Amino acid sequence: MAVIVIADKNTGKTYKKEIDQNVIGLLTGRRIGDEIDGSFFEMPGYKLKITGGSANNGFPMKKDLPIAGKKRILITYTHGRKGKNGIRKRVTLRGNIVGSDISQLNMIITQYGPQPLEKPEEQKGEQ
């Protein structure tokens, strides 16, 4: 079972959907930054852009690492990262290609469909 997290930039809300691994199999080979149709996730009319994700073992995807598997790379801490400037650290990251070992995919809505993502809450009668 995999999870997709869909961010709505207009409202600032995120929506979480659980999907089967066979749907992830249909997305195999796509990269971070690719746009996909929302019909994969029962959201007709929507267009979604892949912004990141993580593998089954928790390693995050990195946009500028063009492989499908994991790799240990040396990163430098600079602005926006904790630590002193100039400190380098070897970390394990996953490449930007979606594979069958993905457990979470992060997406953002680029085109909206006819139906809203949030289901309207039913009015309960007073008791």
UniProtKB/Swiss-Prot annotation:
SMART domains, sorted: Ribosomal_S6e
Protein name: Small ribosomal subunit protein eS6
Keyword Metal-binding: no
GO MF assignments: structural constituent of ribosome
Classification via PANTHER family: 40S RIBOSOMAL PROTEIN S6
Coiled-coil ranges per UniProt: none
Pfam families, per the entry: Ribosomal_S6e
Organism: Picrophilus torridus (strain ATCC 700027 / DSM 9790 / JCM 10055 / NBRC 100828 / KAW 2/3)
Family note: Belongs to the eukaryotic ribosomal protein eS6 family.
Any one GO cellular component localisation term in the record: ribonucleoprotein complex
